[in-house]
């Protein structure tokens, strides 16, 4: 892992890397979803390469270019369908983010497409996806997955349940800027909203992979204007802990990252989040990444708060989420009983949850 971190930090040219170590580094980079970026960093540092490793890096670059072409074409097609429907969506992450932060679509790994539309436009957006061959999955409390062969589109009307983290998505959509992706019109989040979203996205995945932290490192460098103080829009000031933790994690990767958050967090909260960042970073370096389930994720959300009374409000909100959301197992449970309507599924959810309680 140390050699991989050195390459990501721009320190890889300081020593020779044996072929066996290269293979370990490349396997780790693939597992951490940063393989094309590591190759690009090695190229920029002019790291000496044996013929075998040089050939391997060429192969990685070819595969990344082919994959990026596929996802770029898929994103263009979806945006084109939305344009025909009179919709302009905000691509979240994916090829558009790769262009903006990494400099090329082939340098950031994509496995699906995420697009954000207003909640009132979800039905029209779904119809537009159906028209180009997508089929719908089961919606949850803030998005719905759509499928077509090897492509998954996650269609969002929010970026998380507002009871967990209220992104105030309506304000973010109003502030979104006109943009285009390879000639196809779309929208993009304002820089401060995009940075907050990327911090929230990393928290939602519990910083399980280096790719999440590389996104944040580049975002803090390129979306904040450098060392000047960075401030959230007032309506999401309550999410400042996400930025504080995101910056702390980005600095674990790039310690010289210079940025001031305004207003600065209280000293006790800063110490708490720095300690949390230490634990997350140590786990990332020593344990294989595992996507957290819903309960583990919401337990992690509580860790962002100081221990004691500050966690009471989030606990109550998470209980409301647990009681009010419906997910795929709820639909499957209701279907076994012959019920299919969403309101019926919602009514039966408490029964499903109770059926999972172990009997003594």
PLM features: residue spans?
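Conserved NTP-donor binding/palm subdomain of two-metal-ion nucleotidyltransferases/polymerases, i.e.
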Residues: 1-111, 117-360
């Amino acid at each position: 892992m140390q050699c991989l971190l050195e390459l990501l930090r721009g320190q890889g040219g300081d020593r020779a890397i044996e072929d066996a170590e290269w293979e370990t580094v490349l396997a780790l980079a693939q597992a951490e979803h940063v393989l094309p970026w590591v190759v690009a960093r090695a190229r920029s540092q002019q790291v000496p390469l044996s013929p075998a490793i040089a050939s391997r890096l060429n192969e990685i670059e070819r595969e990344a270019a082919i994959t990026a072409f596929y996802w770029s074409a898929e994103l263009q097609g979806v945006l084109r369908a939305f344009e025909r429907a009179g919709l302009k969506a905000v691509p979240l992450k994916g090829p558009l983010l790769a262009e903006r932060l990494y400099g090329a679509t082939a340098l950031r790994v994509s496995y699906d497409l995420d697009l954000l539309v207003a909640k009132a436009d979800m039905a029209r957006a779904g119809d537009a996806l159906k028209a180009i061959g997508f089929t719908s999955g089961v919606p949850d409390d803030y998005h719905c997955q759509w499928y077509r062969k090897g492509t998954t589109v996650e269609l969002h009307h929010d970026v998380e349940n507002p009871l967990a983290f209220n992104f105030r998505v309506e304000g973010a959509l109003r502030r979104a800027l006109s943009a285009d992706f390879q000639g196809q019109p779309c929208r993009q989040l304002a820089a401060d909203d995009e940075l907050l979203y990327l911090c929230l996205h990393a928290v939602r995945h519990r910083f399980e992979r280096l790719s999440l932290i590389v996104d944040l490192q580049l975002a803090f460098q390129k979306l904040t204007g450098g060392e000047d103080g960075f401030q959230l829009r007032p309506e999401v000031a309550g999410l400042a802990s996400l930025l504080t933790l995101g910056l702390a994690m980005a600095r674990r990767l790039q310690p010289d990252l210079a940025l001031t958050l305004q207003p600065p967090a209280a000293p006790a909260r800063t110490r708490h989040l720095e300690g949390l960042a230490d634990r997350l970073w140590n786990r990332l370096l020593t344990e294989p990444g595992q996507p957290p389930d819903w309960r583990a994720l919401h337990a992690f959300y509580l860790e962002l708060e100081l221990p004691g009374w500050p966690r009471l409000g989030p606990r109550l909100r998470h209980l409301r989420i647990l009681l009010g959301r419906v997910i795929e197992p709820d639909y499957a449970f209701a279907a076994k009983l012959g019920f299919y309507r969403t309101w019926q599924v919602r009514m039966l959810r408490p029964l499903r949850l109770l059926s999972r309680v172990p009997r003594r």
